[in-house]
Regions:
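Short catalytic micro-motifs in class I SAM-dependent methyltransferases
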Residues: 124-125
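A short glycine-rich, Lys/Arg-flanked "PGG" loop and its adjoining helix->strand segment in the class I
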Residues: 134-145
Length: 212
């Protein structure tokens, strides 16, 4: 991979990073995921056995078992800007026992990958990106031609935005865009939407990087 850190990183709110570092130790207790709904999302990703996957905002590793069920020769780069979240994920999925998984502490804006991945996943994290347009641009660049970018939540946009609004100043203004706005951002960055669902149960948008 040509990846690494950008020499001009996007500044991230220290308060927001501190919020997630503080919550990491109890995250799995205070954040409940319906695993059947997560499985539904994983099923839409079209994971191939040799895919190279970039997961942004891995948290404590909720998606890792769903990737491992599909991968044979592939791998996962699991990224989070919270050092404590990565530490929690490593405890659950030690790299010696999970050789297909590697962890990286980094913000999305610090990444500088170029056509390195078949699949990029933002599960339950997109509202926390300060500049969502720039995030899509960076993640689209990380994809190989034909690769997929997925933004997904196992709840409705209305519920997600409401939870954030009532969660304190650190993430109180972290909202999902409308599905139409997200589709426009995808299109502007050479991505063709191949799956979308925006209802009371899910917010999912998956797009493929076009060949030209």
């Amino acid at each position: 991979m040509k990846g690494g850190k950008n020499t001009n990183p996007k500044i991230v709110s220290p308060k927001k990073r501190a919020f997630f570092n503080e919550k990491a130790a109890i995250w799995d207790e205070i954040t409940v995921h319906n695993l059947k709904k997560v499985q539904y999302i994983a099923d839409q990703l079209g994971i191939q056995c040799d895919d190279r996957i970039l997961d942004i905002g891995i948290g404590t590793g909720i998606m890792i078992p769903f990737y491992e069920r599909c991968l044979v020769d592939g791998c996962v780069v699991a990224v989070d800007y919270s050092k404590k979240m990565i530490e929690a994920a490593r405890l659950k999925f030690p790299e010696k026992e999970h050789p297909q998984i590697s962890f990286l502490v980094s913000d999305v804006y610090n990444l500088k990958y170029d056509a390195d991945f078949d699949l990029v996943v933002c599960y339950s994290c997109f509202p926390h990106f300060v500049d969502q347009s720039l995030a899509i641009k960076i993640l689209a660049k990380a994809l190989r031609k034909g690769g997929r970018l997925a933004v997904a939540h196992s709840d409705s946009a209305k519920k997600i935005n409401g939870v954030h609004m009532n969660s304190g100043v650190e993430i109180g203004s972290d909202f999902l865009p409308s599905i139409e706005r997200l589709k426009q951002l995808m299109k502007e960055n050479g991505l063709e939407v191949i799956f979308e669902r925006d209802d009371e149960n899910y917010f999912i948008c998956i797009a493929r990087k076009m060949a030209h």
